[in-house]
Amino acid sequence: GKNEGVTFIGTNNKNGAELAANFICDKTPKGADVAILTGMESQSTALLRRDGAIKGLKACGLNIVATQTAEWDTAKARSVTESILVKNPNIKAIFGSNDNMALGAIQALEDAGMNDVVVVGFDATPDAATSILAGKLTATIAQFSYNMGAYGVKYALALANGEKIDANIDTGTQLVTTKNANDFK
């Protein structure tokens, strides 16, 4: 719900997922089959990332054949991806709403001998950065926890000084690929 007078300072998860989707669109032929692994459906972060991915993937003409929860978990993502691959053997890309799920998807793809599928995660964990540099994970989306703290202090001081601040303050996201993955190890 809406809380009057409360400000959210953090990642715009929908925009971050759209950034991931746009990258997938650039790397995947129009009309190709793609899948989305979501977090827990009861959590706003999962829903926002799912919705952002759907918006971005549909906008460029990709065919979303599966949108399934793996509850942020690597082992569940591996199992869910295995099931998706049985029904959709021509899958060309997978968006994992966090890096754990993206890495689980990679395990399932490797088991199936499919190493040409674009896989993008979210969070830019050190394991994800290592996987990108190893040529497995294609990309991930970074969010900036430092900004969350710094902006929190900045805007708390602004409020204390009687200033008005926005209800939502985005702390930023960034695409992480082989070009910048070393910065996130």
Residue ranges and their predicted role:
Residues G1-K185:
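A residue-level marker of the well-folded mature domains of exported/periplasmic proteins
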